[in-house]
């Protein structure tokens, strides 16, 4: 873990990034990481988690884990998702929480790097079904900071909780601001 920590620390320093906030004590959680408008967002999140000494998991398209770099991508925590067919991804992730005592799953709430009319609800349903909290990771390109401003135990009222979640991202500057849209449910 120490090599992982030093890798993350060095990578953040080289990029001029820093972390803010303490990692929560919870052993299982869903982490909403945003704004998500670039592949760099995932790289900075992985590096920040390494600096916090956390091994995280994240969902990525299956093709990322194939080919010569596939092993490295899986090593960083990628859970391959086959997007060519319908899968019960929410159910599979809930089952993963039931099977693993220590699981930190990072999910961009927008679900994509492109601008969206509404955020995806999968992160919320995974957390509710698994009975785990949602921690907010905010990546701000203006300040080059990955921060953890709060953790929310979902109430089951998606609309009310979504307003809380989105409030923590309102002041963040995305790498591509035109692709970051705070939307209603």
How does the language model describe each region?
Residues 3, 7, 11-14, 24, ...:
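Non-catalytic C-terminal accessory region of glycerolipid acyltransferases
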Residues 22-85, 141, 150:
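Catalytic core of membrane glycerolipid acyltransferases/transacylases, capturing the structured
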């Amino acid at each position: 873990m120490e090599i992982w920590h030093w890798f993350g620390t060095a990578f953040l320093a080289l990029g001029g990034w820093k972390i803010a906030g303490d990692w929560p004590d919870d052993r299982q959680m869903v982490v909403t990481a945003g704004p998500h408008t670039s592949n760099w967002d995932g790289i900075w999140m992985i590096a920040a988690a390494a600096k916090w000494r956390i091994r995280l998991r994240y969902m990525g398209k299956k093709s990322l884990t194939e080919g010569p770099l596939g092993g490295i991508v899986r090593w960083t925590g990628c859970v391959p998702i086959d997007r060519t067919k319908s899968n019960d991804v929410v159910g599979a992730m809930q089952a993963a929480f039931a099977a693993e005592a220590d699981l930190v799953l990072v999910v961009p709430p927008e679900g994509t790097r492109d601008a969206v009319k509404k955020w995806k609800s999968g992160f919320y349903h995974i957390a509710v079904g698994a009975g785990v909290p949602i921690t907010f990771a905010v990546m701000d390109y203006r300040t080059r900071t990955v921060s953890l401003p709060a953790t929310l135990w979902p109430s089951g009222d998606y609309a009310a909780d979504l307003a809380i979640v989105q409030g923590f991202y309102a002041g963040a500057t995305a790498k591509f601001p035109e692709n970051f849209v705070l939307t209603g449910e």
